[in-house]
Amino acid sequence: MVSAIVLYVLLAAAAHSAFAAEHCNAQMKTGPYKIKNLDITPPKETLQKDVEITIVETDYNENVIIGYKGYYQAYAYNGGSLDPNTRVEETMKTLNVGKEDLLMWSIRQQCEVGEELIDRWGSDSDDCFRDNEGRGQWVKGKELVKRQNNNHFAHHTCNKSWRCGISTSKMYSRLECQDDTDECQVYILDAEGNPINVTVDTVLHRDGVSMILKQKSTFTTRQIKAACLLIKDDKNNPESVTREHCLIDNDIYDLSKNTWNCKFNRCIKRKVEHRVKKRPPTWRHNVRAKYTEGDTATKGDLMHIQEELMYENDLLKMNIELMHAHINKLNNMLHDLIVSVAKVDERLIGNLMNNSVSSTFLSDDTFLLMPCTNPPAHTSNCYNNSIYKEGRWVANTDSSQCIDFSNYKELAIDDDVEFWIPTIGNTTYHDSWKDASGWSFIAQQKSNLITTMENTKFGGVGTSLSDITSMAEGELAAKLTSFMFGHVVNFVIILIVILFLYCMIRNRNRQY
């Protein structure tokens, strides 16, 4: 009787426990299943942070002494309107300035020219041919004055004016290094970005000026360690690098060709560790660009920006692929952990899938699933005379063990992923070659010459009608004198001919 009562109590307690907690139907098992692991794909990009880089640098611009000298000469003769020798001979000449003169001009900040000759006529007109070197007159700089007059009848007239200028200006330089010998040389660039032969020893005469380098160009060499991003087509072949961008002094340089990469006043080369294959057709480094660095709008800087954009894009892809691979690796590790724990907690897999199922393992990684009932959401470890204990719902008669966990705190047990995201955008911008102060000085002197040659000033003394007739002062009087003299001579000759004919006719009438 007593044993029957004990058995009844145990059955009642078991039934109450099953009713209060979840219930799984072992008759509705499905499967078998295995947890699917994710593929871990390594990124195509490889980041090397300690790449040895050789940098050769020179000054961005160089001081160039620029000077010019020339003269305008008008040598005229007035023999009257009937004299075919009446004319004005104009001469415009630019003189080459020698090395010694350029250096002296630079020291004195003055240039040397000849004497201004204004309305020299008669024997004084020979002064036009006495000094064609331009010596004796030191000025800060001057522009010639175009003078013409031919108002001295039966005499020669000379007008001669000088121009000169001196400036120590900047011209942009470019450094070039030979791949075979690693020898480097500095070139001075013209307005189009082409190298010109300006040295400290030889004067270059071009564009109407003479120029010489003030000091010999020098360059420095240094070694640094930089972060380089290697892009690979074939992840399994370490020799398949097709692109390599390095972050150097906040600028991005393409070192894909393992040769000297020269931009403006800097050349960069890295230690050869691998052979770079041919680049994809979408962006060819070894094909000449449709633009030239240093042109108007600084297209060389646009090339720099393009390199930065490509670098940033490749870096972003690398970081995303690294993150994807890292997440997949963690997921696979988590899968192994889930399988291990699910052998103890049969509801784990169902909870992770947000589904009320229970798992029963057939082997180390294969299991069956069965549907289960689940209590509603709650904020306590107790529910309907049940308590959640050691991963399961069990019967509970001690309410003191119930805990309200509505105000819980989060505990961090892992760290965030560290990404390599350098700050870029501090690109070193360069001016256009033609914006160098030296070429601006040359362009300005050309403009001044064009302006002064468009305005002619006439010397001499004479008529007040020069502004109306566009003649030199005194030239109108000379022309009128020549005109009257010529007509008087013609009148006398015609009168003599008429008298001669009259006399002949009269004598002939007398004979008859």
Swiss-Prot record:
Belongs to the baculoviridae gp64 family. GO terms for cellular component: host cell plasma membrane; membrane; viral envelope; virion membrane. It is found in: Virion membrane; Host cell membrane. Residues 1-20 form the signal peptide. Glycans are attached at N159, N197, N354, N384, N426. Gene3D superfamilies: 2.40.50.710, 6.10.250.2130, 6.10.250.3010, 6.20.460.10. Palmitoylated. It comes from the Viruses. The keyword Chaperone does not apply. Class III viral fusion protein. Envelope phosphoglycoprotein which mediates the fusion of viral and host endosomal membranes leading to virus entry into the host cell. After receptor-mediated internalization of the virus, gp64 undergoes conformational change into a fusion-competent state at low pH, and the nucleocapsid is released into the cytoplasm after cell fusion. May also play role in budding. This is Major envelope glycoprotein. InterPro entries: Baculovirus_Gp64 (IPR004955). GO terms for molecular function: identical protein binding. Homotrimer; disulfide-linked.
